[in-house]
Amino acid sequence: MESYNNASLIKLINELEKMPGIGPKTAQRLAFYLLKSEKADVEKLAGSILEAKEKIKYCSVCFNMTEIDPCAICTSLRRDRSLICVVEEPMDIVALDNTGAFKGLFHVIMGSISPLDGIGPEDLKIRELLIRIGKENIKEVIIATNPDVAGEATAIYLSKLIKPLGVKVSRLAQGMPMGGSLEYADEVTLARAIEGRREL
Amino acid sequence: MRLSSLFVHNFKNIGELDLPQLSGVNIITGRNASGKTNTLQSIYFLSTLSTQFKTYQQAVRFGADFFSVKGGLESSGAQKSLEVRYGPGRDVKLKLNGNTVAKKSDYIGECRVVNFAFEDIDLVRGTPGERRRALNILISQVNRGYLKSLQKYTAVLAHKNKLLSEAFKKRPDAAVLEAFNEQLCESGAEVIKIRKEAAVFLSQAFDLAHKRISLGLESASLEYKCSFECVGDLKAAFAAKLKELLPAEIARGTTLIGPHKDDMLFKINGREAKYYASDGQQRTLVFSFKLAEYRYMQDAVKDDPVILLDDVFYELDADRKAAVLEFFRPMPQLFIVSLEADWVKKVFPDAASFRISGGALQDALQKE
Ligand SMILES: Nc1ncnc2c1ncn2[C@@H]1O[C@H](COP(=O)(O)OP(=O)(O)OP(=O)(O)O)[C@@H](O)[C@H]1O
Ligand SMILES: [Mg+2]
Ligand SMILES: [Zn+2]
């Protein structure tokens, strides 16, 4: 790119482009926006990125993102502690919690079983989930992995492990578009999916 | 259904080809290597998103970094527009009536085609893979559920085969394999069921067409050949056989049965045509099969597909040529490539004709 004989600008664009959902054009727009902004604003942004990065950790119980460990969901007294909803990513907790239709606990397994990406059960927080089920008084596990091939395989795999423990296992209803991911499903669809969950 | 306009940009040897007004019968003429087949292929691609190449990249015009094909469509009284663009880079962009469509399965089937080409003979002579591909493209154009099941099956199969291919390094977790097998059976059974139903319809239409061409002397049939014994509950039979084959699959590092291993046999007088049909018989058989494809689509969606004819009169004497053309006369839209355009024009005096040269339009002579 001859039009930018400016190494630092190219570097900034490259860094921005690494983020999910950001293509080269958007990366350029963001970079120019930042350069046009007041220095104080840019410092505020850089500061908040660093601060969040330093303060936010994974909850040692459910692997949600949190500043305080265990997280607010895990320590809440207003939640139904006999219900665990299993999701792939911390993002999915936000989507499901916003529906207000689910009042139980969560467990993030950090991905899905995907041989093509070299991810097996041992790479996920599945052992931790089984330990939780053994320790806590769990009556039902709702599996809310994504409705794609890997998410579906993870759901089948989990139900085979959990059912023998005498715990009810259900799957989020197929109200969601096939291959879609939870974070993009709207709240109404998700709420319906929670209510209409089917037992596995 | 009818294609009312076509615009092709950088597709194979075609630089820019703008055909704003298409007719019922469209004759495409030009010298060897001018781009006649490529013009038909662009319509085929616009409809099915398939080319004879392994990658879309190979269809990008040498020296260019993208291609696009656009078409206007009249389908049961409605006007539609379709657009597909590949590159720069590797992304495929699909548009329907100007709106971006994210999934192929929401696009394929909007424009439906049957392509008659010289290499159709490979359907009889070639590998099972070629026959499966023909079935997949045919059924996908009229049944989106089929395409979705097929896509799911292919995705699950890729995961499972990856597990199996690494089995020598690391013994696969039986529960993980089972999680993929369960999905494989579900989508695979659906694919087989729909293919078998299609084969039953196709076989009848195939025999009828073939009888008409062979003057009732020969009987032709198609038989869907499943890679495992698929009687009773398909899904259960598939699951049981996979369970039985698990050790063998682990040893071989791949999935041994399923719709990706099935075949469709062409038979003439009860014998497999691959071995027992003469060259001429094989030509007539594939021709009859293509006509059966047409009937299948017509029956499934109550609408006629667009017909692409690429020099199918090659090797036929005048009487047979005339007889073959009679099959096409009642169909609403034909694109005919022929080196003997004058002769075709006599048969279809109202046809529009387009002369292609060097991948572009040389002149458009439209008869009123
Ligand atoms: N990606 C590409 N870029 C440029 N040219 C290409 C590309 N792919 C194929 N071609 C060329 O396009 C030319 C025209 O091909 P096409 O098959 O359309 O000819 P045709 O008019 O049907 O000729 P014939 O009468 O011999 O069948 C071929 O010479 C082929 O090499
Ligand atoms: Mg040709
Ligand atoms: Zn927590």
Language-model segments: residues:
Chain A
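Glycine-rich, flexible loop/turn motifs
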Residues: 58, 70, 92, 109-112, ...
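Cys/His-rich Zn2+-binding cysteine-cluster or related metal-binding knuckle/ribbon modules and their
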Residues: 2-9, 31-84, 89-93
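Conserved phosphate/pyrophosphate-binding and hydrolysis machinery centered on Walker-type P-loop NTPases
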Residues: 2, 20, 39, 52, ...
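Signal for well-folded cores of large energy- and translation-related assemblies
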Residues: 17, 35, 50, 63, ...
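S-adenosyl-L-methionine-dependent methyltransferase catalytic core, i.e., the SAM/SAH-binding region
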Residues: 10-18, 28, 34-37, 65, ...
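Extended interfacial segments that mediate partner engagement and assembly in macromolecular machines
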Residues: 27, 76-142
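Long C-terminal interaction/binding lobes of large macromolecular proteins
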Residues: 130-142, 147-200
